[in-house]
């Protein structure tokens, strides 16, 4: 279920329309970062704005004003730490970085393994999943599901 949810979130993030999917915070969240981290955040501002993150850079501080609608407000610092790390690690092309942001967000926001889902949540996930372009792999490359062939069944049941 988690891998399916990651795939759904990932494809939603890649097709994100910030005008409709950004939620303004009632109270801005202030996060303190080092000068080098703030410099990196400044570099990626346009990319993050496209995902629905709205923020103002101040001296030694980042003031977050809006976040994507399906992001958890309590994880904002973790999101920005992930984005900084991704930017530092390698991604220089805009499209590659957009993919990295989408992967980080879906990983943080996917259903947790021990969470019990209601039947309506499972049904909604199933419908959303079948609208995805890629239904075999989650964004990390792990297989979501596998079709059972007679060959595979015989390997599993082999005495």
Regions from the PLM with identified roles:
Residues 1-159:
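Long, charged low-complexity intrinsically disordered regions
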């Amino acid at each position: 279920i988690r891998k399916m949810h990651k795939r759904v979130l990932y494809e939603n993030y890649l097709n994100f329309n910030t005008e409709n999917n950004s939620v303004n915070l009632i109270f801005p969240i202030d996060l303190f970062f080092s000068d080098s981290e703030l410099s990196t955040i400044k570099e990626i501002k346009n990319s993050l704005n496209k995902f629905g993150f709205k923020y103002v850079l101040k001296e030694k501080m980042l003031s977050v004003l809006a976040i994507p609608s399906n992001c958890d407000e309590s994880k904002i610092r973790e999101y920005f730490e992930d984005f900084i790390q991704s930017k530092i690690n390698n991604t220089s092309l805009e499209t590659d970085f957009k993919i990295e942001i989408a992967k980080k967000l879906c990983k943080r926001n996917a259903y947790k393994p021990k969470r019990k889902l209601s039947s309506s949540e499972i049904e909604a996930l199933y419908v959303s999943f079948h609208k995805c372009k890629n239904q075999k792999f989650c964004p990390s490359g792990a297989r979501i599901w596998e079709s059972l062939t007679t060959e595979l069944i015989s390997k599993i049941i082999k005495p």
